[in-house]
Curated annotation (Swiss-Prot):
Gene3D superfamilies, alphabetized: Fe-S hydro-lyase, tartrate dehydratase beta-type, catalytic domain
Cofactor requirement: [4Fe-4S] cluster
Protein name (record): Fumarate hydratase 1, mitochondrial
GO MF annotations in UniProt: 4 iron, 4 sulfur cluster binding; fumarate hydratase activity; metal ion binding; protein homodimerization activity
Activity regulation, per record: Specifically and competitively inhibited by 2-thiomalate, which coordinates with the catalytic [4Fe-4S] cluster.
Source lineage: Eukaryota, Discoba, Euglenozoa, Kinetoplastea, Metakinetoplastina
Role this protein plays: Catalyzes the reversible hydration of fumarate to (S)-malate. Catalyzes the hydration of fumarate to L-malate in the tricarboxylic acid (TCA) cycle to facilitate a transition step in the production of energy in the form of NADH.
Name of the encoding gene: FH1
Cofactor note: Binds 1 [4Fe-4S] cluster per subunit.
GO biological process, one term: malate metabolic process
The keyword Iron is annotated on this UniProt entry: yes
NCBIfam families for this protein: ttdB_fumA_fumB
Location(s) in or outside the cell: Mitochondrion
Residues that hold [4Fe-4S] cluster according to the record: C114, C233, C328
Amino acid sequence: MLRRLAPLLAEFNFVPLVSKVSHKETKYRLLTKDYVSVVQPGAGLPEMLRVDPAALTLLSSTAFDDVEHLLRSSHLMSLRKIFDDPEASDNDKFVALQLLKNANISSARLLPGCQDTGTAIIAGYRGDQVFVPGNDEEALSRGVYDIFQKRNFRYSQNVPLSMYDEKNTGTNLPAQIDLYASKGMEYSFMFVAKGGGSANKSFLLQETKSVLNPKSLRNFLKEKLAMFGTSACPPYHVAVVIGGTSAEMTMKVLKYASCHYYDDLITKPDMKTGYTFRDLELEEEVLKVCQNIGMGAQFGGKYYAHDVRVIRMPRHGASCPIGIGVSCSADRQALGKINKDGVWLEELEMEPSQYLPDLKEDELLKTPAVMVNLNRPMPEVLQELSKHPVRTRLSLTGTIIVARDSAHARMREMLEAGKPLPQYMKEHPVYYAGPAKQPDGLPSGSFGPTTAGRMDPFVDLFQSHGGSMVMLAKGNRSKQVTKACHKYGGFYLGSIGGPAAVLAQNAIKKVECLDMKDLGMEAVWRIEVENFPAFIVVDDKGNDFFEQL
């Protein structure tokens, strides 16, 4: 006779999904001792930290002022190390030099480091002994509003008027604010300015148990990491999260990891302190994969990534979510905290010039740039470009039209309605970009390129109507663009993604709004440039630089 076995019951053992990280190496600067006080509520209750909402507004405003203009010293050191690596390509070093120059310019707080000053993202952890009268989110949002009004930033947030119609808010609000409960008498924060380029390179991949073995996982990551391409402005800080109790948890940890928030995480699973851990060995392997992809720091080489963070999490037995993402060369985040001693913000590097190498561009570039005069008929410009192979470095001078997503969509509507493509799209090169605000006394605000790939669906249509014959932007493009350029005799020129302040200060001489002013920063602009740097990426013969890597 069979006996029924009693089920084995595991003892209750609470283990946090992600163990607490200390950030003990982070250095902070004191903003103020105002707005905080310790109060005794009585009735046997513990003392409380009272935080005036003005403290949240000050911290938020100062944090975004800093991250838009300054970088962490660790990021700058990673750029500087490229010059000491004999395996780094000349292209790697050239891009790194531009990014360091850009950091030096933006540290003056007149031009932000990137024209896409991003979505304001705030994560806050409020201790149970912290009391804030009023609305925390409102106070933090006020700080975002204040600094975006004050500084030469860009308003990038669109709100829906209907399912299909939308408008720019003109404030960069709403911000994304996630607030959590924690223990203690401290309110801690992470502030992130996340641009569209790197945000769009966050991928959730729903896999299965079959990928959880060394060979399969390595092959999987080798294939998927190339999906980033160069449009999010490498060198990257790459993050990989394997597992997760839900899709949203995987992606949240991914974003935090790309910001180095979990650098202090345990490196082995611990049944008492935490299951989620960093795999340092796999991080080194994945970094080598990135170095061998060939894209390098945008135009070929080793430095596709500065570093890699790989985090393993618990998962449901039927699911294996994997998240991969990046923080780009505009690596913009800072920690903050409010405690009984005052309001504190992470120290970012205010003297980036110390990381500049004693090196001139001419020492890196073996051949001089081809000078291209854009102020002549388009057929002549195309004839000049056709003389040179992909990879050729150019120096552009003349008139360029600036148009991006919304302007392209409106022009397509014009064509669909039987109207002609605007003449300026036929007579001049088109630069995919959207400027930050123009500082007083300067011809341009920060004005770097946006991701070219988003405009790929428009290229064949526009070129068939004689427009977009020369395109200028950042990143690699799809085969449909290569085919269109081959068919119609067009070109795609790549610009370095990241050094938006350098371009504004050195290459852009005049900016004026030409058309579609109601689109805000996505309006059509006319700019005059002088020695604007670019590379031939796709030519009129069916060649694509990135396909040759």
